Amino acid sequence: MKPFALAGLLQLTERRAEGLSRAVKLAHGVWLRARGRQVQLASLRDAHVTGLAGRLRGGVAAGQLREMNRLQRAQAAELHAAQTAIDAAHVAWQARLAEWLQVEQRLKALRLLQQRHLAQVAIQQKRIEQHQHDELVELAHRRDAGRWGR
């Protein structure tokens, strides 16, 4: 019987799908860590704002107020950078996911073709076995007919 003609391609596609699966998981982890960093920064900012509100009620010098404002701007810039990192990580994750899904569809199609090939091979094998059986029966019948005909 002929081997599955696309076996090599199927094997390569399986390896590619496995590699892409790992890449999707890695990209998702990067995205989750970026989100965690943003939550951490927002929590620090909120704690700073709460502390700042208490200090402002008691009054602060102009120099201290400038320093507090500078710190708030720095925190806002960090939060913006964190959001940018989240967005980039999300885009990368979605791109990997889309690529993996495409390869998975190709893999599914190749596996279906392989199943059809195996089914066809099984049918051919049954036909060969049936043909061989029929030949044996015919030979036995001729042999028996030759004995009785004498």
Annotate each predicted stretch with a short phrase.
Residues 1-150:
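Charge-rich amphipathic alpha-helical interaction elements
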